[in-house]
Amino acid sequence: VVNRRQFLKLSSIAGTQLWNRRGFAFEPADYSLTIARTSLEVASHRFIKTTAYNQQSPGPLLRMKEGVPVTIEVTNQSDDDEIVHWHGLFLPPAIDGAMEEGTPHIPAGKSARYTFTPEPAGFRWYHTHTAAGSNLKKALYSGQHGFLSIEPRNDPGRYDQEYFLALHDWDGTLVGSDDGSMNPIYSYSTINGKVLGFGEPLRVRQGQRVLLHIVNTSATDPHWLALAGHQFRVVALDGNPVPSPRAVAMLHLSPAERITAEVEMNDPGVWVLGEVRKHVQAAGMGIVVEYANHSGKPVWQQPQTLEWDYLLFGAADASEPSGDIKVNRIPLIFNSKFVGHGAMDRWMINGRSFPDTETIPLKLGQRYRLIFKNESLDDHPVHLHRHTFEVRRMAGRTTRGILKDTILVKAGTESEVEFTANAPGLSLFHCHQQDHMDMGFMMLFQST
Protein backbone atom coordinates (compact mmCIF):
# COMPACT_ATOMS: atom_id res chain seq x y z
CA VAL A 1 0.00 0.00 0.00
CA VAL A 2 1.32 3.42 -0.96
CA ASN A 3 1.46 6.07 1.76
CA ARG A 4 0.63 9.71 1.05
CA ARG A 5 4.23 10.85 0.61
CA GLN A 6 4.93 8.04 -1.84
CA PHE A 7 1.72 8.79 -3.68
CA LEU A 8 2.49 12.47 -4.13
CA LYS A 9 5.85 11.47 -5.56
CA LEU A 10 4.11 9.10 -7.94
CA SER A 11 1.64 11.84 -8.83
CA SER A 12 4.32 13.94 -10.46
CA ILE A 13 4.92 11.02 -12.81
CA ALA A 14 1.41 9.66 -13.26
CA GLY A 15 -0.46 12.93 -13.55
CA THR A 16 -2.88 12.76 -10.64
CA GLN A 17 -3.10 14.32 -7.21
CA LEU A 18 -5.43 14.01 -4.26
CA TRP A 19 -6.63 17.19 -2.64
CA ASN A 20 -9.04 18.47 -0.05
CA ARG A 21 -11.92 20.10 -1.91
CA ARG A 22 -11.03 23.44 -0.33
CA GLY A 23 -7.33 23.01 -0.95
CA PHE A 24 -6.04 24.32 -4.25
CA ALA A 25 -7.47 26.22 -7.19
CA PHE A 26 -7.48 24.32 -10.46
CA GLU A 27 -8.22 25.00 -14.05
CA PRO A 28 -11.68 23.59 -14.78
CA ALA A 29 -11.66 19.84 -15.29
CA ASP A 30 -12.80 18.35 -18.58
CA TYR A 31 -15.15 16.06 -16.67
CA SER A 32 -16.52 16.07 -13.13
CA LEU A 33 -17.93 13.05 -11.32
CA THR A 34 -19.60 13.14 -7.92
CA ILE A 35 -20.04 9.92 -5.96
CA ALA A 36 -23.11 10.18 -3.74
CA ARG A 37 -26.16 8.38 -2.47
CA THR A 38 -29.23 8.65 -4.67
CA SER A 39 -32.62 7.12 -5.31
CA LEU A 40 -33.25 5.68 -8.78
CA GLU A 41 -36.71 4.97 -10.16
CA VAL A 42 -36.12 1.71 -12.04
CA ALA A 43 -39.82 1.03 -12.63
CA SER A 44 -42.99 3.02 -12.08
CA HIS A 45 -42.98 3.97 -8.38
CA ARG A 46 -40.22 1.44 -7.71
CA PHE A 47 -37.09 3.04 -6.31
CA ILE A 48 -33.62 1.68 -5.59
CA LYS A 49 -31.47 3.47 -3.02
CA THR A 50 -27.87 3.22 -4.16
CA THR A 51 -24.59 5.04 -4.69
CA ALA A 52 -24.00 6.44 -8.16
CA TYR A 53 -22.14 9.03 -10.23
CA ASN A 54 -23.80 12.44 -10.70
CA GLN A 55 -27.13 11.19 -9.32
CA GLN A 56 -27.62 8.83 -12.25
CA SER A 57 -26.87 5.25 -13.22
CA PRO A 58 -25.26 4.59 -15.56
CA GLY A 59 -23.05 7.61 -14.97
CA PRO A 60 -22.42 10.19 -17.68
CA LEU A 61 -20.75 9.18 -20.94
CA LEU A 62 -17.14 10.39 -20.91
CA ARG A 63 -16.23 10.87 -24.56
CA MET A 64 -12.51 11.40 -25.20
CA LYS A 65 -10.19 11.60 -28.19
CA GLU A 66 -7.25 9.25 -28.53
CA GLY A 67 -4.01 11.02 -27.64
CA VAL A 68 -5.65 14.21 -26.29
CA PRO A 69 -4.97 14.69 -22.53
CA VAL A 70 -7.98 14.98 -20.23
CA THR A 71 -8.55 15.91 -16.60
CA ILE A 72 -11.28 14.28 -14.52
CA GLU A 73 -12.24 15.51 -11.06
CA VAL A 74 -13.95 12.99 -8.80
CA THR A 75 -15.63 14.18 -5.60
CA ASN A 76 -16.65 11.61 -3.02
CA GLN A 77 -19.79 12.72 -1.19
CA SER A 78 -20.61 9.22 0.02
CA ASP A 79 -19.97 7.97 3.55
CA ASP A 80 -17.32 5.47 2.45
CA ASP A 81 -13.84 5.65 1.01
CA GLU A 82 -14.16 5.08 -2.73
CA ILE A 83 -12.06 4.44 -5.81
CA VAL A 84 -12.69 4.65 -9.57
CA HIS A 85 -11.21 2.11 -11.98
CA TRP A 86 -10.81 3.22 -15.60
CA HIS A 87 -11.49 -0.19 -17.09
CA GLY A 88 -9.60 -1.05 -20.27
CA LEU A 89 -7.30 1.99 -20.26
CA PHE A 90 -3.50 1.87 -20.22
CA LEU A 91 -2.73 3.88 -17.07
CA PRO A 92 -0.02 3.88 -14.38
CA PRO A 93 -0.79 1.92 -11.19
CA ALA A 94 -1.14 5.13 -9.16
CA ILE A 95 -4.29 6.10 -11.09
CA ASP A 96 -5.56 2.85 -12.64
CA GLY A 97 -8.07 2.53 -9.83
CA ALA A 98 -7.11 -0.57 -7.84
CA MET A 99 -5.98 -0.33 -4.24
CA GLU A 100 -4.00 -3.55 -4.71
CA GLU A 101 -1.81 -1.79 -7.30
CA GLY A 102 -1.27 1.24 -5.08
CA THR A 103 -4.04 3.60 -6.20
CA PRO A 104 -5.21 5.50 -3.10
CA HIS A 105 -8.85 5.58 -2.13
CA ILE A 106 -10.72 8.87 -2.31
CA PRO A 107 -11.68 9.50 1.33
CA ALA A 108 -15.27 10.40 2.13
CA GLY A 109 -15.69 14.16 1.72
CA LYS A 110 -12.56 14.55 -0.43
CA SER A 111 -11.76 14.87 -4.12
CA ALA A 112 -9.22 13.43 -6.54
CA ARG A 113 -8.07 14.82 -9.85
CA TYR A 114 -6.79 12.58 -12.63
CA THR A 115 -4.91 13.82 -15.70
CA PHE A 116 -3.92 11.34 -18.39
CA THR A 117 -3.72 10.77 -22.12
CA PRO A 118 -6.46 8.26 -22.99
CA GLU A 119 -5.55 5.08 -24.84
CA PRO A 120 -6.30 2.71 -26.43
CA ALA A 121 -9.16 3.87 -28.65
CA GLY A 122 -12.46 2.08 -28.22
CA PHE A 123 -15.37 1.46 -25.89
CA ARG A 124 -14.19 1.42 -22.26
CA TRP A 125 -16.01 2.04 -18.97
CA TYR A 126 -15.44 3.22 -15.42
CA HIS A 127 -16.63 1.74 -12.15
CA THR A 128 -15.95 1.37 -8.45
CA HIS A 129 -13.32 -1.15 -7.35
CA THR A 130 -14.02 -1.82 -3.67
CA ALA A 131 -15.06 -4.88 -1.67
CA ALA A 132 -18.68 -5.69 -0.87
CA GLY A 133 -18.55 -8.89 1.18
CA SER A 134 -22.10 -9.83 2.10
CA ASN A 135 -23.43 -6.27 1.60
CA LEU A 136 -25.21 -6.44 -1.74
CA LYS A 137 -25.69 -2.66 -1.85
CA LYS A 138 -22.00 -1.80 -2.16
CA ALA A 139 -19.22 -2.00 -4.75
CA LEU A 140 -20.31 -3.39 -8.13
CA TYR A 141 -23.78 -4.17 -6.74
CA SER A 142 -24.32 -0.39 -6.56
CA GLY A 143 -24.95 2.08 -9.38
CA GLN A 144 -21.30 3.11 -9.66
CA HIS A 145 -20.63 2.50 -13.34
CA GLY A 146 -20.52 4.61 -16.48
CA PHE A 147 -19.50 4.66 -20.14
CA LEU A 148 -16.14 5.83 -21.45
CA SER A 149 -15.51 6.10 -25.19
CA ILE A 150 -12.13 6.94 -26.70
CA GLU A 151 -12.57 8.03 -30.30
CA PRO A 152 -9.76 6.96 -32.64
CA ARG A 153 -7.58 9.64 -34.19
CA ASN A 154 -8.42 8.93 -37.81
CA ASP A 155 -11.64 6.92 -37.97
CA PRO A 156 -14.90 8.90 -37.69
CA GLY A 157 -17.01 5.75 -37.94
CA ARG A 158 -19.60 4.74 -40.51
CA TYR A 159 -23.01 4.66 -38.84
CA ASP A 160 -26.09 6.86 -38.56
CA GLN A 161 -26.44 6.94 -34.79
CA GLU A 162 -25.13 5.12 -31.73
CA TYR A 163 -26.48 4.07 -28.36
CA PHE A 164 -24.64 3.10 -25.18
CA LEU A 165 -26.36 0.42 -23.09
CA ALA A 166 -25.52 -0.84 -19.59
CA LEU A 167 -26.91 -4.13 -18.28
CA HIS A 168 -27.29 -4.26 -14.51
CA ASP A 169 -28.88 -6.30 -11.72
CA TRP A 170 -30.30 -4.65 -8.59
CA ASP A 171 -31.55 -5.33 -5.08
CA GLY A 172 -29.71 -8.59 -4.53
CA THR A 173 -30.32 -11.12 -1.77
CA LEU A 174 -28.00 -13.96 -0.80
CA VAL A 175 -29.68 -17.35 -0.89
CA GLY A 176 -28.37 -20.82 -0.23
CA SER A 177 -27.96 -23.29 -3.08
CA ASP A 178 -28.17 -27.07 -3.01
CA ASP A 179 -24.42 -27.40 -2.42
CA GLY A 180 -24.55 -25.13 0.64
CA SER A 181 -22.93 -22.11 -1.02
CA MET A 182 -24.47 -18.62 -1.01
CA ASN A 183 -25.37 -16.86 -4.26
CA PRO A 184 -27.18 -13.60 -5.04
CA ILE A 185 -30.59 -13.36 -6.69
CA TYR A 186 -31.96 -10.01 -7.86
CA SER A 187 -35.30 -8.21 -7.79
CA TYR A 188 -34.68 -6.09 -10.88
CA SER A 189 -32.60 -6.38 -14.04
CA THR A 190 -32.34 -3.28 -16.20
CA ILE A 191 -30.91 -1.68 -19.32
CA ASN A 192 -29.65 1.83 -18.55
CA GLY A 193 -31.26 1.71 -15.12
CA LYS A 194 -34.85 1.13 -16.32
CA VAL A 195 -36.98 -1.98 -16.68
CA LEU A 196 -38.51 -2.92 -20.02
CA GLY A 197 -41.20 -0.44 -21.03
CA PHE A 198 -40.37 2.18 -18.41
CA GLY A 199 -37.41 3.95 -19.98
CA GLU A 200 -37.27 5.87 -23.23
CA PRO A 201 -37.15 3.66 -26.35
CA LEU A 202 -34.29 3.54 -28.81
CA ARG A 203 -35.75 5.60 -31.66
CA VAL A 204 -34.58 4.61 -35.14
CA ARG A 205 -35.48 5.06 -38.80
CA GLN A 206 -35.75 2.51 -41.56
CA GLY A 207 -32.48 2.11 -43.45
CA GLN A 208 -30.29 3.39 -40.63
CA ARG A 209 -27.15 1.64 -39.46
CA VAL A 210 -27.18 1.89 -35.66
CA LEU A 211 -24.12 1.17 -33.54
CA LEU A 212 -24.81 -0.38 -30.13
CA HIS A 213 -22.15 -0.24 -27.40
CA ILE A 214 -23.19 -2.72 -24.70
CA VAL A 215 -21.50 -3.37 -21.35
CA ASN A 216 -22.47 -5.87 -18.67
CA THR A 217 -22.05 -3.96 -15.39
CA SER A 218 -23.63 -6.69 -13.25
CA ALA A 219 -21.73 -7.62 -10.12
CA THR A 220 -22.16 -11.34 -10.73
CA ASP A 221 -24.40 -12.40 -13.61
CA PRO A 222 -23.87 -13.00 -17.34
CA HIS A 223 -26.53 -11.85 -19.79
CA TRP A 224 -27.87 -12.97 -23.16
CA LEU A 225 -29.42 -10.40 -25.53
CA ALA A 226 -31.47 -10.62 -28.71
CA LEU A 227 -33.29 -8.00 -30.79
CA ALA A 228 -36.51 -9.32 -32.25
CA GLY A 229 -36.60 -9.06 -36.04
CA HIS A 230 -32.91 -8.18 -36.37
CA GLN A 231 -29.35 -9.44 -36.13
CA PHE A 232 -26.20 -7.98 -34.60
CA ARG A 233 -23.06 -7.54 -36.69
CA VAL A 234 -20.33 -7.75 -34.05
CA VAL A 235 -17.50 -5.35 -34.91
CA ALA A 236 -15.61 -5.07 -31.60
CA LEU A 237 -15.14 -6.98 -28.35
CA ASP A 238 -14.13 -5.10 -25.20
CA GLY A 239 -13.72 -2.03 -27.42
CA ASN A 240 -11.21 -3.65 -29.79
CA PRO A 241 -12.06 -4.26 -33.48
CA VAL A 242 -12.39 -7.94 -34.36
CA PRO A 243 -10.61 -9.48 -37.38
CA SER A 244 -13.82 -11.05 -38.72
CA PRO A 245 -17.01 -9.06 -38.07
CA ARG A 246 -20.02 -11.38 -38.30
CA ALA A 247 -23.79 -11.21 -37.94
CA VAL A 248 -25.25 -13.23 -35.07
CA ALA A 249 -28.72 -13.66 -33.64
CA MET A 250 -27.78 -13.03 -30.02
CA LEU A 251 -25.04 -11.69 -27.78
CA HIS A 252 -23.53 -13.05 -24.57
CA LEU A 253 -21.79 -10.77 -22.09
CA SER A 254 -20.18 -11.88 -18.85
CA PRO A 255 -19.60 -9.27 -16.13
CA ALA A 256 -17.30 -6.46 -17.42
CA GLU A 257 -17.43 -7.59 -21.05
CA ARG A 258 -18.35 -5.15 -23.81
CA ILE A 259 -19.68 -5.74 -27.30
CA THR A 260 -19.98 -3.18 -30.08
CA ALA A 261 -22.40 -4.28 -32.80
CA GLU A 262 -24.00 -2.74 -35.86
CA VAL A 263 -27.70 -3.28 -36.49
CA GLU A 264 -29.25 -2.64 -39.90
CA MET A 265 -32.67 -1.18 -39.25
CA ASN A 266 -34.51 -2.98 -42.03
CA ASP A 267 -37.66 -4.35 -40.36
CA PRO A 268 -39.96 -1.45 -39.38
CA GLY A 269 -42.06 -1.85 -36.28
CA VAL A 270 -41.81 -1.73 -32.50
CA TRP A 271 -39.50 -4.41 -31.13
CA VAL A 272 -37.95 -5.62 -27.87
CA LEU A 273 -34.19 -5.71 -27.35
CA GLY A 274 -34.09 -7.96 -24.33
CA GLU A 275 -32.64 -10.75 -22.23
CA VAL A 276 -33.18 -14.11 -23.90
CA ARG A 277 -33.86 -15.98 -20.66
CA LYS A 278 -37.51 -15.49 -19.74
CA HIS A 279 -37.05 -15.05 -15.99
CA VAL A 280 -34.42 -12.31 -16.46
CA GLN A 281 -36.54 -10.43 -18.99
CA ALA A 282 -39.46 -10.77 -16.56
CA ALA A 283 -37.24 -9.04 -13.96
CA GLY A 284 -37.03 -6.12 -16.38
CA MET A 285 -34.03 -6.55 -18.65
CA GLY A 286 -35.10 -5.12 -21.97
CA ILE A 287 -35.61 -1.92 -23.91
CA VAL A 288 -38.01 -0.96 -26.70
CA VAL A 289 -36.68 -0.26 -30.21
CA GLU A 290 -39.17 2.00 -31.98
CA TYR A 291 -39.09 2.87 -35.68
CA ALA A 292 -40.26 6.33 -36.74
CA ASN A 293 -43.98 6.47 -37.58
CA HIS A 294 -44.66 3.18 -35.83
CA SER A 295 -46.43 2.53 -32.54
CA GLY A 296 -48.11 -0.26 -30.64
CA LYS A 297 -47.14 -3.04 -28.27
CA PRO A 298 -43.48 -4.06 -28.59
CA VAL A 299 -42.94 -7.45 -30.22
CA TRP A 300 -40.65 -10.11 -28.77
CA GLN A 301 -39.58 -13.28 -30.57
CA GLN A 302 -38.26 -15.94 -28.21
CA PRO A 303 -35.08 -17.69 -29.44
CA GLN A 304 -35.13 -21.45 -29.00
CA THR A 305 -31.45 -21.93 -28.20
CA LEU A 306 -28.57 -20.04 -26.59
CA GLU A 307 -25.68 -19.64 -29.02
CA TRP A 308 -22.45 -17.67 -28.64
CA ASP A 309 -18.88 -18.32 -29.71
CA TYR A 310 -15.98 -15.85 -29.35
CA LEU A 311 -14.02 -17.68 -32.01
CA LEU A 312 -16.44 -16.71 -34.79
CA PHE A 313 -14.77 -13.30 -34.79
CA GLY A 314 -11.14 -14.45 -34.93
CA ALA A 315 -8.76 -14.32 -37.88
CA ALA A 316 -9.31 -16.82 -40.68
CA ASP A 317 -5.80 -18.19 -40.12
CA ALA A 318 -5.65 -19.37 -36.51
CA SER A 319 -2.23 -21.02 -36.76
CA GLU A 320 0.63 -20.19 -34.43
CA PRO A 321 2.77 -17.32 -35.78
CA SER A 322 6.18 -18.28 -37.10
CA GLY A 323 9.36 -16.53 -36.00
CA ASP A 324 11.75 -16.33 -33.12
CA ILE A 325 9.52 -14.49 -30.64
CA LYS A 326 9.93 -16.14 -27.26
CA VAL A 327 6.69 -16.64 -25.37
CA ASN A 328 6.89 -17.28 -21.62
CA ARG A 329 4.15 -19.61 -20.39
CA ILE A 330 2.44 -19.00 -17.04
CA PRO A 331 -0.08 -21.62 -15.84
CA LEU A 332 -2.90 -20.34 -13.63
CA ILE A 333 -5.21 -22.92 -12.05
CA PHE A 334 -8.59 -21.76 -10.69
CA ASN A 335 -10.36 -23.65 -7.93
CA SER A 336 -12.12 -23.07 -4.64
CA LYS A 337 -12.00 -24.16 -1.05
CA PHE A 338 -15.52 -25.16 -0.14
CA VAL A 339 -16.75 -23.77 3.16
CA GLY A 340 -20.53 -24.21 2.99
CA HIS A 341 -23.05 -23.94 5.82
CA GLY A 342 -24.01 -20.39 4.85
CA ALA A 343 -20.42 -19.16 4.55
CA MET A 344 -18.57 -17.83 1.51
CA ASP A 345 -16.16 -20.06 -0.38
CA ARG A 346 -12.51 -19.09 -0.77
CA TRP A 347 -11.39 -18.81 -4.37
CA MET A 348 -7.82 -19.69 -5.25
CA ILE A 349 -5.29 -19.21 -8.04
CA ASN A 350 -2.58 -21.89 -8.04
CA GLY A 351 -3.74 -23.03 -4.62
CA ARG A 352 -3.60 -19.62 -2.92
CA SER A 353 -6.20 -17.02 -2.07
CA PHE A 354 -5.49 -13.27 -2.14
CA PRO A 355 -3.63 -11.62 -0.41
CA ASP A 356 -1.50 -14.78 -0.22
CA THR A 357 -1.41 -15.35 -3.99
CA GLU A 358 1.99 -15.12 -5.66
CA THR A 359 3.02 -11.82 -7.26
CA ILE A 360 4.44 -13.00 -10.58
CA PRO A 361 7.44 -11.05 -11.96
CA LEU A 362 7.41 -10.05 -15.64
CA LYS A 363 10.16 -8.55 -17.79
CA LEU A 364 9.17 -5.44 -19.70
CA GLY A 365 8.96 -6.03 -23.43
CA GLN A 366 8.65 -9.80 -23.19
CA ARG A 367 5.70 -11.83 -24.43
CA TYR A 368 3.68 -13.99 -22.02
CA ARG A 369 1.02 -16.63 -22.45
CA LEU A 370 -1.38 -17.13 -19.55
CA ILE A 371 -2.76 -20.66 -19.47
CA PHE A 372 -6.05 -20.65 -17.56
CA LYS A 373 -7.21 -24.00 -16.22
CA ASN A 374 -10.58 -23.74 -14.53
CA GLU A 375 -10.94 -26.75 -12.22
CA SER A 376 -13.96 -25.28 -10.45
CA LEU A 377 -17.67 -25.76 -11.12
CA ASP A 378 -18.19 -22.05 -11.83
CA ASP A 379 -17.51 -19.93 -14.90
CA HIS A 380 -15.04 -17.07 -14.36
CA PRO A 381 -14.87 -13.78 -16.30
CA VAL A 382 -11.22 -12.91 -15.63
CA HIS A 383 -9.83 -9.40 -16.18
CA LEU A 384 -6.26 -8.16 -16.55
CA HIS A 385 -5.72 -4.51 -15.62
CA ARG A 386 -3.64 -2.08 -17.71
CA HIS A 387 -3.25 -4.46 -20.68
CA THR A 388 -5.03 -5.88 -23.69
CA PHE A 389 -4.46 -9.56 -24.39
CA GLU A 390 -4.93 -11.71 -27.49
CA VAL A 391 -7.13 -14.78 -27.17
CA ARG A 392 -5.15 -17.77 -28.49
CA ARG A 393 -7.01 -20.89 -27.40
CA MET A 394 -10.41 -21.77 -25.92
CA ALA A 395 -11.47 -25.28 -24.94
CA GLY A 396 -8.93 -26.86 -27.29
CA ARG A 397 -9.63 -24.58 -30.27
CA THR A 398 -7.03 -22.09 -31.49
CA THR A 399 -7.68 -18.54 -32.66
CA ARG A 400 -5.86 -15.30 -33.42
CA GLY A 401 -6.57 -11.60 -33.52
CA ILE A 402 -9.28 -11.30 -30.85
CA LEU A 403 -8.11 -8.61 -28.42
CA LYS A 404 -9.81 -8.32 -25.04
CA ASP A 405 -9.24 -7.35 -21.41
CA THR A 406 -11.85 -9.73 -19.95
CA ILE A 407 -12.52 -13.32 -20.98
CA LEU A 408 -14.95 -15.95 -19.75
CA VAL A 409 -13.23 -19.20 -18.75
CA LYS A 410 -16.00 -21.75 -18.48
CA ALA A 411 -16.14 -24.37 -15.74
CA GLY A 412 -13.91 -27.35 -16.41
CA THR A 413 -12.20 -25.80 -19.45
CA GLU A 414 -8.86 -24.28 -20.38
CA SER A 415 -8.18 -21.02 -22.23
CA GLU A 416 -4.96 -19.30 -23.27
CA VAL A 417 -4.24 -15.61 -23.87
CA GLU A 418 -1.07 -13.71 -24.79
CA PHE A 419 0.11 -10.21 -24.00
CA THR A 420 3.28 -8.14 -23.99
CA ALA A 421 4.43 -6.84 -20.60
CA ASN A 422 4.56 -3.15 -21.53
CA ALA A 423 3.12 -1.51 -18.40
CA PRO A 424 5.73 -0.93 -15.64
CA GLY A 425 4.68 -1.71 -12.10
CA LEU A 426 1.87 -3.74 -10.59
CA SER A 427 -1.08 -5.01 -12.64
CA LEU A 428 -4.06 -6.67 -10.99
CA PHE A 429 -5.60 -9.87 -12.34
CA HIS A 430 -8.93 -11.07 -10.97
CA CYS A 431 -12.31 -12.62 -11.58
CA HIS A 432 -14.79 -9.82 -12.28
CA GLN A 433 -17.55 -11.47 -10.29
CA GLN A 434 -17.74 -9.34 -7.16
CA ASP A 435 -18.30 -12.27 -4.81
CA HIS A 436 -15.40 -14.26 -6.29
CA MET A 437 -13.09 -11.25 -6.13
CA ASP A 438 -14.06 -10.56 -2.52
CA MET A 439 -13.34 -14.17 -1.62
CA GLY A 440 -9.75 -14.14 -2.84
CA PHE A 441 -9.83 -14.55 -6.64
CA MET A 442 -7.10 -11.96 -7.27
CA MET A 443 -3.37 -11.81 -7.90
CA LEU A 444 -0.73 -9.34 -9.11
CA PHE A 445 1.86 -9.17 -11.86
CA GLN A 446 4.95 -7.00 -11.37
CA SER A 447 6.58 -5.72 -14.58
CA THR A 448 10.15 -4.38 -14.37
Over which residues does each language-model region extend?
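C-terminal segment of N-terminal export signals and the immediately downstream linker at the start
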Residues: 1, 18-49
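N-terminal secretory signal peptides and thylakoid transit peptides that target proteins
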Residues: 1-15
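Extended terminal and domain-junction accessory segments
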Residues: 10, 18, 24-32, 135, ...
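Extracytoplasmic beta-sandwich strand-turn segments characteristic of Greek-key/jelly-roll folds
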Residues: 57, 61-63, 88-120, 197-202, ...
